[in-house]
């Protein structure tokens, strides 16, 4: 058996069903093996057990192929459920959750618990991972976004060395979207904003933002496969995109203009969307790049 055949046989041992064509994988591995890939996990993936399991499986495949993956997870649906139990209603301004002290306590617990769950699930896939959260190992230095939003922070600095220590252990860093300011006050961060800040700081090759839609739509409600930052700005200016997609696009544009080669807003509801985005020309959403 030749080296190529042996490689494929090994790959088949962990390559999922209904994933992209296995014969094309090696060329994409060569493309990404020296790069970093930041993945923001959010939306329905967080609450649908099957989608969550597929997400964990996809990440473990990337790891087993030797790719450097960094995960930033959201917690919107879980936070919403916990707040509802306590009869706490959330207000949103431009897609960002207004966070008072009581809300902050709920947000922190939900995010820390979910962080631990992701690490545990990955370990069961024989995939070493390490949680980096605001309670035990803060990685994001923030400043307050604005007073109207309460305890919502904007990333000011990413402590790259903490992330690199985990990568050097051949483990996956799993980050919660929270940070501390210079006075150690904790702040909630929009998960897309946190992911973009990490991707910029690490100069990652790709940033994948998982959503509950196919990607970005044009004025005719058709999926846009690829778009550049200027075209993305026009979609916002013309109010073609609204709600939670606005911060996603703004963060994507910011990331592209600060060293990230490509940002993909991908459909997290599609099975193995991460593998289709990384290992095929088919993709799984909207690619934003220059």
Annotate the PLM regions.
Residues 1-269, 276, 282, 289-290:
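Nucleotide/pyrophosphate-binding catalytic subdomain
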